[in-house]
């Protein structure tokens, strides 16, 4: 055994020794000796782009233009040395980036890109502008063309501008500088640009000079045009402008901001202070400072410009590697430059697309599960506007001769929406050396799909992959492993998982076009969430105050399949809307209710709802964009608000009318938010656009399969009693043998009771939630926990607990006699939370009937807490008791209350009344029912009383003047004397009469039959007694007071006899 191991090690050493001497690690199989360079040629001419490659023969060369392979033609010929000749050049056809590709038996490599520029017709992108200056000033004109190179010159008055004076300087970039202008410099200037294809002139700009009287005043130095920040390619010229004026003429000097000396070998001064570098190199990069100083003084001014000479360069190059089958290769490539270079990876001259085994992270290329086909050239291309650079490396895959053959006869069978069974046969060769199998699978559709791997032992030839997404095609292959390496991969098989119910519903967008409609729109679910082909949508809606839900089912159609208009709605009403989604397997859980208030009905024209778009930028911010709908209304601004699902709205953000975008920050990850936007005008707020968005989760550990657990599904709640609800749910399908637990969240559905939320922890998939309030609507949600991770909450379900029979009797039972044979009984609802009463039962009977068990029964609706007991017999004592009932049963009766009904009316006594608390006087709040007979009597009595009052007032006023002298006499027994004295008293005290008579007219209903101090108005019975001192008028029937003493001892309120009328006034406490 030891000799075998030593022999194997010797084989590996020999392989590495041979490879090193063959130049593999030195990389000598293929290279470029000459690469194409940037070139500019006139249209109609020809150009030769050079390219020569070396390596192991045979080596062939081909060319690409803008990434597309070039085919030879009459104008395009491939020369024998690999160069490319292009004749009869045209800008539209031939201008672009060229690249040569060399290949041999080991693979292919590409060169860097060379730009071919065709000089065409020039067009001015900037024209000179007119100037008006004083004599002796500095003039500056500039122009620019759309392409370079171009020769630029200047003309004055359509003649060439003489440049024999050092006052005039023309820069290569098209700038004309004239120092110390004189009258002969006045005129019209224009710019002339020329190349091999055209010659063009700019618009004219006139220079107007203003004469100056007397000597020029002293001026501090001023830089009119300073250096600009510029990026320049290697070996190209660059000019840094510095034009200054002042009196006396300032001196211009240059320096570097980093205090390094300026390279004078390539730099020179152009004109009066402009710095020119003829051929830029990398060390010329830096910040250059122009300084204008007044001679002999310390007065100066400066201007700075940055020169960037940083073409792409590689600071870390990929290295060639040798790896065994099923190993992992990593290539690194880091580049720098300005602008920042973009890195592209190539394999054998073709751009690499990431897939299951090939990934790119931070400009690094990683290849896992290496197969023989990965043996190739790998290149890193760094490119920006200043150029490109390429680095080449090689991956060599070493294979063992004794490796097993690939597994055979791969077969896949679908088990469910998330599981597929794989079966295979052992390798045909060296099957006894297999120690394990590796199953590789990935999604078949799309790009950049991640490849997953499952390793199993060699004792089985089947495996269930149960962590798949529903309704997806998956591709599988298997690799057999032995101690020395891996087999070739097996044939690939593709299998489709079954559909499932959708994982969630789309986000809804709600807008109103009128006060009576709501437009509901949504985006189609992505395949990961739909878990199959969506067949229908179910839209449910109701008002916030009504629990009756209306639903409409919408089959999926090609057109307008993602919106629906709810019509015939109520204006200014809050509607709750939710959605369910269906595949052919079944319906998803409905979404949470989304609220939307329909607009008010108004004759004023307000802005329509804008079109709203929401896009999560990251886990804590969302981009909000809106587009105002076409309207004639002048928009004065926008209002934006947002809030998490289930919470009240935050403050409103007001935005100006020109803003159509806003970013909401500081959000929580994995939370559903409601966003609302409306436009407002002078007529008020417009229609509102409402949409929801879910923030994604923040990035966590990469390559973690369970980055987020799915929530429990199929949550179902059923009321078990008045205080308990049975809750059940399903565990989501995912492959993990780890134990899971669940959290149940429940609480009243009313937002005002949000603080009453409770939680239950359980490891089962069902729980009995107890301790609930009867007849209360509760909401329930469940989440899953596993390995210190938690899923989102499941969709909320709602359930109302059952009714509970009344447990206590009605309270505050009171009985009051309001007529000789009629009593009023009132009560309060039993003191029991959330109690629903359907009806009340009133039992009453006289004592004799009670002993005989003969009760009379009255029933009143649950909203009524009063009843009239009629046809009571005088001289009896009645017993009364009440109970409450609902659909769940009857409650207990209250304590018995007695009511004594007198046989004869008596003087000065109130009617007999009683209650459960033995109170002397009963105040009855609210309305009670009066039958038609009693109401007719009350109306007749009120009419008689009002007639008497009007007659009395008329008599009092008519007798005032004639009865003054008799005002001091006592009241006589005759009716005319009584009326005479009443008129005399009214004459003496007219103000009191007015004050006292008015209250009598305020009572709507007065019992004219007498016998009670109980008044009945539109609100019910009113007790006339009071503990405060007040004035009172009383009208009673009486023949005559016999003497003064009797009048003092009797209560005027109780003097009631038929046949006589007495009008009394007094103060009482």
Swiss-Prot record:
List the subcellular locations.
Membrane
Q: Which GO terms fall under biological process for this protein?
A: cell-cell adhesion
Top-level taxon of the source organism: Eukaryota
This protein's major location comes to membrane
| Extracellular-side positions | 27-936
Q: Which residues are glycosylated?
A: 81, 88, 180, 229, 299, 306, 458, 473, 560, 618, 720, 834
Cite the entry's keywords alphabetically.
Developmental protein, Disulfide bond, Glycoprotein, Immunoglobulin domain, Membrane, Repeat, Signal, Transmembrane, Transmembrane helix
- One matching Pfam family is Ig_3
Cytoplasmic topological domain ranges are 958-1069
- Please list the disulfide bridges: 51-100, 143-191, 242-290, 333-380
Task: Using the record, list the residue span of the signal peptide; answer none if the entry has no such feature.
Answer: 1-26
Domain Ig-like, residue spans: 30-117, 122-208, 221-308, 312-396
Q: How does it sit in the membrane?
A: Single-pass membrane protein
Biased-composition ranges, Polar residues, are: 590-605
Stretches that traverse the bilayer: 937-957
Fetch the InterPro entries from UniProt: FN3_dom, FN3_sf, Ig-like_dom, Ig-like_dom_sf, Ig-like_fold, Ig_I-set, Ig_sub, Ig_sub2
A GO CC annotation recorded here is:
membrane
Q: Which SMART domains match?
A: FN3, IG, IGc2
> Which part of the chain is the Fibronectin type-III domain?
406-500, 502-601, 608-701, 711-804, 809-904
What is the reported tissue distribution? Initially expressed in the ventral forebrain and ventral spinal cord. Later, also expressed in the midbrain and in parts of the diencephalon and hindbrain.
Summary of the function given for this chain in its UniProt record: May play a role in anteroposterior axis elongation.
Q: Which family does it belong to?
A: Belongs to the immunoglobulin superfamily. DCC family.
Its recorded name reads Protogenin B
Which gene carries the instructions for this protein?
prtgb
């Amino acid at each position: 055994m030891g000799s075998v191991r030593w022999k194997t090690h010797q084989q590996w050493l020999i392989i590495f020794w041979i490879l090193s001497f063959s130049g593999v690690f030195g990389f000598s199989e293929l290279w470029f000796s000459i690469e194409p360079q940037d070139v500019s040629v006139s249209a109609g001419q020809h150009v030769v782009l050079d390219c020569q490659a070396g390596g192991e023969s045979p080596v062939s060369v081909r060319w690409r233009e803008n990434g597309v392979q070039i085919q030879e033609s009459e104008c395009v010929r491939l020369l024998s040395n690999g160069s490319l000749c292009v004749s009869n050049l045209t800008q539209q056809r031939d201008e672009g980036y060229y690249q040569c590709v060399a290949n041999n038996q080991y693979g292919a490599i590409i060169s860097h890109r060379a730009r071919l520029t065709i000089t065409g017709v020039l067009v001015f992108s900037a024209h000179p502008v007119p100037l008006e200056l004083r004599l002796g000033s500095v003039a500056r004109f500039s122009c620019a063309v759309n392409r370079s190179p171009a020769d630029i010159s200047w003309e004055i008055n359509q003649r060439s501008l003489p440049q024999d004076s050092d006052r005039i300087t023309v820069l290569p970039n098209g700038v004309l500088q004239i120092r110390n202008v004189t009258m002969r410099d006045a005129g019209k200037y224009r710019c002339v640009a020329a190349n091999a294809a055209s010659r063009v002139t700019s618009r004219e700009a006139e220079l107007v000079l203003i004469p100056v009287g007397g000597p020029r005043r002293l001026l501090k130095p001023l830089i009119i045009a300073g250096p600009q920040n510029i990026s320049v390619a290697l070996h190209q010229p660059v000019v840094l402008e510095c034009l200054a004026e002042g009196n006396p003429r300032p001196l211009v000097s240059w320096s570097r901001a980093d205090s390094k000396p300026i390279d004078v070998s390539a730099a020179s001064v152009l004109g009066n202070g402009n710095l020119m570098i003829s051929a830029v190199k990398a060390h010329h990069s830096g910040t250059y400072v122009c300084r204008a100083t007044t001679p002999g003084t310390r007065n100066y001014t400066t201007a700075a410009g940055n020169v960037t000479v940083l073409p792409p360069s590689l600071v870390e190059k990929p290295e060639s590697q040798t790896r065994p089958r099923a190993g992992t290769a990593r290539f690194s490539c880091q580049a720098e430059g300005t602008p920042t270079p973009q890195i592209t990876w190539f394999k054998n001259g073709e751009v690499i697309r990431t897939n299951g085994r090939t990934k790119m992270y931070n400009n690094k290329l990683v290849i896992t599960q290496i197969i023989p086909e990965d043996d190739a050239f790998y290149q890193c291309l760094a490119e920006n506007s200043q150029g490109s650079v390429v680095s080449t490396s090689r991956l060599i895959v070493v294979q063992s001769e004794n490796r097993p053959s690939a597994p055979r006869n791969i077969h896949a069978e679908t088990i469910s929406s998330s599981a597929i069974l794989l079966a295979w046969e052992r390798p045909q060769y060296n099957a006894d050396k297999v120690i394990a199998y590796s199953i590789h699978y990935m999604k078949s559709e799309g790009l950049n799909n991640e490849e997953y791997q499952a390793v199993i032992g060699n004792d089985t030839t089947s495996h269930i992959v149960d962590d798949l997404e529903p309704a997806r095609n998956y591709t599988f292959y298997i690799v057999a492993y032995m101690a020395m390496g891996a087999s070739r991969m097996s044939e690939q098989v593709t299998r489709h998982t079954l559909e499932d119910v959708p994982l969630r519903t789309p986000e809804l967008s709600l807008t109103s076009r009128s006060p009576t409609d709501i437009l509901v729109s949504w985006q189609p679910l992505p395949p990961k969430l739909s878990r199959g082909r969506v067949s229908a949508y179910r839209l449910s809606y109701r008002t916030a105050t009504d629990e009756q839900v209306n639903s409409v089912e919408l089959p999926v159609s090609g057109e307008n399949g993602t919106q629906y208009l709810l019509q015939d709605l109520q204006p200014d009403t809050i509607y709750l809307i939710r959605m369910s989604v269906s595949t052919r397997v079944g319906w998803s859980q409905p979404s949470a209710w989304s609220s939307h208030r329909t607009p008010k009905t108004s004759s004023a024209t307000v802005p329509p709802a804008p079109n709203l778009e929401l896009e999560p930028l990251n886990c804590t911010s969302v981009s909000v964009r809106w587009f105002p709908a076409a309207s004639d209304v002048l928009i004065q601004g926008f209002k934006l608000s947002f809030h998490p699902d289930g919470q009240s709205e935050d403050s409103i953000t007001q935005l100006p009318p020109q803003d159509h975008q806003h970013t909401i920050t500081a959000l929580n990850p994995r939370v559903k938010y409601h966003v609302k936007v409306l436009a407002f005008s002078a007529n008020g707020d417009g229609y509102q656009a409402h949409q929801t968005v879910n923030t994604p989760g923040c990035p966590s550990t990469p390559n973690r399969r369970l980055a987020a657990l799915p929530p429990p599904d199929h949550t179902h709640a059923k009321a078990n009693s008045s205080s308990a609800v049975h809750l059940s749910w399903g565990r989501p399908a995912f492959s993990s043998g780890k134990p899971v637990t669940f959290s149940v969240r429940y609480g009243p559905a009313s937002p005002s009771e949000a603080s009453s939320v409770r939680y239950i922890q359980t490891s089962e998939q069902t729980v009995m939630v107890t301790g609930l309030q009867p007849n209360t609507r509760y909401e329930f949600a469940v989440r899953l926990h596993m390995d210190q991770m938690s899923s989102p909450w499941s969709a909320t379900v709602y359930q109302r607990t059952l009714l509970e029979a009344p447990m206590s009797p009605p309270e505050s039972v009171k009985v009051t006699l309001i007529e000789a044979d009629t009593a009023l009984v009132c009560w309060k609802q039993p003191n029991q939370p959330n109690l629903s009463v359907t009806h009340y039962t009133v039992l009453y009977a006289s004592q004799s009937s009670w002993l005989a068990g003969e009760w009379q029964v009255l029933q009143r609706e649950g909203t009524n807490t009063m009843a009239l007991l009629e046809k009571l017999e005088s001289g009896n004592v009645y017993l009364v008791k009440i109970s409450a009932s609902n659909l769940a049963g009857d409650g207990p009766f209250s304590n018995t209350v007695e009511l004594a009904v007198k046989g004869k009316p008596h003087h000065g006594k109130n009617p007999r009344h009683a209650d459960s608390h033995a109170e002397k006087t009963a105040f009855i709040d609210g309305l009670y029912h009066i039958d038609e007979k009693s109401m007719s009597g009350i109306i007749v009595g009120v009419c008689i009383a009002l007639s008497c009052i009007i007659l009395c007032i008329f008599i009092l006023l008519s007798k005032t003047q004639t009865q003054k002298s008799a005002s001091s006499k006592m009241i006589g027994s005759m009716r005319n004397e009584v009326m005479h004295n009443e008129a005399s008293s009214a004459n003496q005290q007219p103000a009191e009469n007015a004050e006292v008579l008015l209250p009598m007219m305020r009572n709507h209903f007065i019992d004219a039959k007498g016998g009670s101090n109980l008044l009945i108005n539109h609100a019910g019975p009113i007790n006339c007694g009071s503990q405060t001192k007040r004035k009172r008028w009383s009208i009673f029937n009486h023949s005559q007071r016999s003497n003064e003493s009797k009048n003092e001892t009797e209560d005027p309120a109780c003097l009631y006899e038929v046949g006589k009328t007495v009008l009394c006034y007094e103060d009482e406490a």
